[in-house]
Amino acid sequence: MPTMRNSIFSEKIYPILLSAYRWYLRTPERSLEEAYKAALNIKAIEDEHFNGNKIDFNSAIYSNSVMDYFESDLAQELKTARMRLTEFRFSRWFSNESHQKAARKAGIEYPSSNVTLEKLKFIDEVISKYIITDYEIVAPSGVSESQVRTTSSQPPENPSLTDALRTNDINKNNLVERIYTPTSPPQLIKQRTEQSKKSRGKADTTGILPRSILSTIGRLQIELDPNAEQDVINNFRQAQKRSIISIRFILLIIIVPLLTHQLSKALIVSPIFNHFKNDHTEQIFLNSEMEEEALSTLHRFEERIKFENLISNAPPLSAEAIETQIKEKAEELAAEFRGESSNAIKNVFADIFSVGAFIWLLLVSKPSIMVLKEFFDNVVYGLSDSAKAFIIILFTDVFVGFHSPHGWEVILEGLSRHWGLPANRDFIFLFIATFPVILDTIFKYWIFRYLNRISPSAVATYRNMNE
């Protein structure tokens, strides 16, 4: 009998284990090869359709549908290359001398270090072009490094004429920004900030012509510039992409945790819980509040039966009949609160899955978070001072205002019922006495530190409205 078992193991199970071990040992080579293939695919798109240059989404050679097709392929290949490079690094980190010896015994030959280095170098050369792709989704096309260098390198022969030209460049970019308010990568933000500082310094000085005439000249030059329309179109496309990415990410961070909670509760937590629970020894009430609610409901039911028995024209019920109805109601309440207790326990584990899904979504969506931040910056800073002050007052009054303790109390009691915990009044009152105060301090510090520097007029409007 043992010999038969050994023969079955050697004939069926051992080859499966050996092939799985070979697959594990080949993980570094396989990951690097897949990343290399993804880089080759990107390079092929560049060579065939962009003359060997970087894939430019603002190119006017192809239509929007074609560029969307290239963008989808590029995103997929970049994702594959980066994931496989990460897998390669981790598998190399776990690889040691014993694994290499086992690979040689299994007949596995790793590629030479020169081949590996050449592939890694090629992958880095291809991927490095798209490191700031997420910035470029929201980057304006109206400002380029060459324009900044040309503007800063020209000597100011005529102060007024120089002011007019610089004012024209700034107004051209500001016109597009006022229409679609695109954002910029850090390098362009720094360059444009330095350029605007120089322009403001020149504008503050007294020139031959008034500044209003210079701004009029700049506006006319913008209207007559043949590239102005293309700049507006490009910035509209970038703003549209930014809005789509931001709204999609907002929907994801709302829908994914809720969907994870419902699916994990129905498909994972409930079957496991129902398998291990014992209906005979299962606790009916998780806390004293549930018990008090059940007893109060049963007492009201008993009083209602007696009251209806006294005022009805039908023959009075006997004590046994009343006791039977009360017993049926008690069993109904026991089943109801047993289900509520089980549901509360399931909610705890389902919420853990939801939090895990939320954290995972944040970790894998860092580019989307950056785009979302830029989107909110443009929306908030595009509001008027009165609107900013109104929103600040609304949020502060809701969360830290005079009536906010009632809202916090409802939220905490709802969370307690959701998890089957008793509503601890001492903890609730302590939370209400401390957390809104901390939140109010953070609000005031943010207003004093950041908003006062970014928009002093909004702070002044906020103070006037608050008074």
UniProtKB/Swiss-Prot annotation:
Keywords: Cell inner membrane, Cell membrane, Hydrogen ion transport, Ion transport, Membrane, Transmembrane, Transmembrane helix, Transport. NCBIfam families: PRK02507.1-1 (NF002703). The gene is pxcA. Residues 146-167, 186-205 are annotated as: Disordered. It is found in: Cell inner membrane. Pfam families: CemA. GO terms for cellular component: plasma membrane. One of its GO terms (molecular function) is proton transmembrane transporter activity. The keyword Membrane applies. Its main location: membrane. The chain crosses the membrane at residues 249-269, 352-372, 391-411, 427-447. This is Proton extrusion protein PxcA. Residues 146-161 have a biased composition (Polar residues). It is a multi-pass membrane protein. It comes from Nostoc sp. (strain PCC 7120 / SAG 25.82 / UTEX 2576). Residues 191-203 have a biased composition (Basic and acidic residues).
